[in-house]
Amino acid sequence: LDNDRQSIVKNFSSLEPSQWSKRNKAHIIQNQTIHNKKILPHKLSFGSDYFYGKSSPNAPVIADGLFPPFSYARGGFSEGWGAAVLPPDDCDLEDWPIKSFHLKPYFSKVLEDLPYSACEDGLSKDFPLYSDDLKPIKLTKGNSTLLQSMSKSNKMQQDKIAFGQARLLTRANTDLLKPGCKYCGYCMSGCVYDCIYKSSQ
């Protein structure tokens, strides 16, 4: 991340969201890719695409047609991701020599050291929680209404569609060392409080 954005993020991390300057906030939440109709929008981190790999003289990329995104950043794509996390279903592992139950003890072990926003819901039957230490993010009124409407839908039950609250590697509550989610609403731009887990942490 460039020095200018790092400076703003550091400053904002010591303030409440209501104290952020409008000008600096606009600088780190901007995403010019959503205005370009010729390309798919990119997820950015504080307005920067620094974590996406690009061809360079020292690491040239030669490709015919579309090339999957890659990253040279420390922490890779977790530097800009949304931290969604679900265990694989057996249908996701059809070409693997193992089944999801073989991984169960390792999912539980990994989650011991990570912030985990999750709750028992309609996803749990197909996607076990693998943790008893659940600290779910509080849903907005709109999200709660959506989930309630889906729960009442006969169509969802007939088609056996699994749904529920997003499972996120996100620190919902303040702990001894770090603040929890401030519910500022800018998660998709990056979290100045480092509540969204990155593998570089």
Regions inferred by a protein language model and the residue ranges of each:
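Core domains of carbohydrate- and sulfate-ester-processing enzymes
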Residues: 48, 52-54
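Short, solvent-exposed loop/turn and secondary-structure capping segments
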Residues: 8-12, 83, 174-175
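Conserved redox-cofactor binding core of oxidoreductases
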Residues: 24-47, 58-63, 67, 89, ...
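Conserved phosphate/anionic-ligand binding catalytic regions in large, soluble enzymes, centered on
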Residues: 69-84, 187
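Glycine-rich FAD pyrophosphate-binding loop
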Residues: 1-23
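Short, solvent-exposed loop/turn segments at secondary-structure junctions
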Residues: 5-6, 78, 85-87, 170-171
